[in-house]
Amino acid sequence: MTVRESAFVNGRWLAGGGVEFESLDPVTQDCLWKGAAASDDVVGQAVQAARQAFTSWGRLDVSRRIDIVKRFAELLEEDKERLADVIGKETSKPLWEARTEVASMVAKVGISIQAFNERTGVSEQDVAAGHAVLKHRPHGVLAVFGPYNFPGHLPNGHIVPALIAGNTIVFKPSELTPWFAEETVRIWAKAGLPDGVLNLVQGARETGVALAANDGIDGLLFTGSSPTGHSLHRQFGGRPEKILALEMGGNNPLIIAPPYDLKGAVHHTLFSAFVSAGQRCTCARRLLVPDTAEGQAFLDELIAAAANLQVGRYDADPQPFMGGVISLRARDQMLAAQNKLAAEGGRILLEMRSLEENASLLSPGVIDVTDVQELPDEEHFGPMLQVLRYRDFDHALELANKTGFGLAAGLISDSRDLYDRFWLEVRAGIVNWNKPLTGASSAAPFGGVGASGNHRPSAYYAADYCAYPVATLEADQAQAPAQLSPGMSL
């Protein structure tokens, strides 16, 4: 495969200038895309192009910006099957799920327009000091870092509101999903986005460090792992003038508490733990069940159902529930994590296994870690669910909050009283009741606390960090007051 011109700067495709890398099909290991990482020089060109485009883009009437964003959504809809196929090939996500990702990208446009008007619109009122006006301005040049698990939907959740607000962008996707990022940028160009408004730099850590360190950016919007987010936070230390929005991972608890519908509880747990092969930041990582005969009966049903989940290629017919994890490296990391927990006292209830020698396909795994003395507070990004048995609901809440993360938490129980207490006491930015933990609405804020984020939730609240408020007192004419301040004469 030939090396592509992988950087998009000021409306032109350029050679990246850095080290060459590939995107591989996680299951077949076929090369899907080959390009070069953006060098420091190309990163600088991209930032400069965004800076030059900012003046005209930011001054363009918001209705014109929205027209272009709406055209982008129309083009996504027209090309949705091909785009879903690209997502499926590059991530191993089954087509049924890849289609929902493209649909989410389309829906994000209308939601972002509504959020812009509601969260960052114009308000006016007469006050004692004069006429008060609140408006919002774009920050300027924003870097957007995207993850691999939702290579379209998640960066789109930053890019769309940032463009509506009048910012220009330098986009650095995950080095594991460069192909879909390229396809997205091509659609933006086709939608009529002016040159320089959206620029693309490909690459891994070195490219990200260079972009984050560039003095020409006014902020950075990040979705990804907690270690990378913490690294960016350290890199931004001493730079309070830069906006930094971090949406990171979680070690999310899901509590099962009687009474509950057994089939409903099993379904929601399976979906929470294993959808996307466990590669959603909101996936349940820790399952808290009562240490009773009823709790054991629930686990027996869960394990039997998990063992029957279908795993396979993204385009298999009939469709599987799960595809593979993102890479062979990710597969090996998950198997190593399972082995480590077992060595530390965990009891494997359903073994996570590699299903093909040179493929990233993993079967679901469930491991009882109740007896692990020093349970690591880590996000294992794959199809492995850890079980903790609790004595009573006080103990369940204690275990749920025994994490430095704070992204998502869920309760499966018919008891409203337990839920009311759970909502008040659990520490998380997303709290679900009798719904899958992975269920979240773009019409609501999305984000967490602690090691899961820095209190700048995305989704509906992305509008808040894509523009800053400007408070104004206005009068048609400067007039001296009827009574001057003490010690003043005119």
Curated annotation (Swiss-Prot):
Keyword Oxidoreductase recorded: yes
Keyword annotations: Arginine metabolism, NAD, Oxidoreductase
Protein name: N-succinylglutamate 5-semialdehyde dehydrogenase
GO biological-process terms attached to the record: arginine catabolic process to glutamate; arginine catabolic process to succinate
Active site: residue positions: E247, C281
Positions with a binding annotation for NAD(+): G224, S225, S226, P227, T228, G229
Organism: Hahella chejuensis (strain KCTC 2396)
GO molecular function, one term: succinylglutamate-semialdehyde dehydrogenase activity
Matches recorded under Gene3D superfamilies: Aldehyde Dehydrogenase, Chain A, domain 1, Aldehyde Dehydrogenase, Chain A, domain 2
Superkingdom to which the source organism belongs: Bacteria
NAD as UniProt keyword: yes
Catalytic activity: N-succinyl-L-glutamate 5-semialdehyde + NAD(+) + H2O = N-succinyl-L-glutamate + NADH + 2 H(+)
Pathways per UniProt: Amino-acid degradation; L-arginine degradation via AST pathway; L-glutamate and succinate from L-arginine: step 4/5
Its EC number(s): 1.2.1.71
